[in-house]
């Protein structure tokens, strides 16, 4: 019974990751990164990456709400 519950838990985690692990880092399609620091905004990172804000947001699959909640320490794709 415990093995069955463990398998269900593992399946749940894998499904959850499939839906939440979709940024460029997990996809392996990025060659240049920017790590978010305290106080950073999407605009700050786009400027550091030398891309437009729109390009930065599309590359990282971000919307305006996600840019309000930049995750400190997270790697964001520049290209």
UniProtKB/Swiss-Prot annotation:
Q: Which UniProt keywords apply?
A: Secreted, Signal
Main subcellular localisation: secreted
Protein name per its UniProtKB record? Putative uncharacterized protein DDB_G0289443
Q: Which PROSITE patterns match?
A: LYSM (PS51782)
Q: Which InterPro entries match?
A: LysM_dom, LysM_dom_sf
Record's signal peptide: 1-24
Where in or outside the cell it occurs: the entry states:
Secreted
Listed GO CC annotations: extracellular region
Gene3D superfamilies to which the protein is assigned, alphabetical: LysM domain (3.10.350.10)
| Domain LysM, chain residue ranges per copy | 32-78
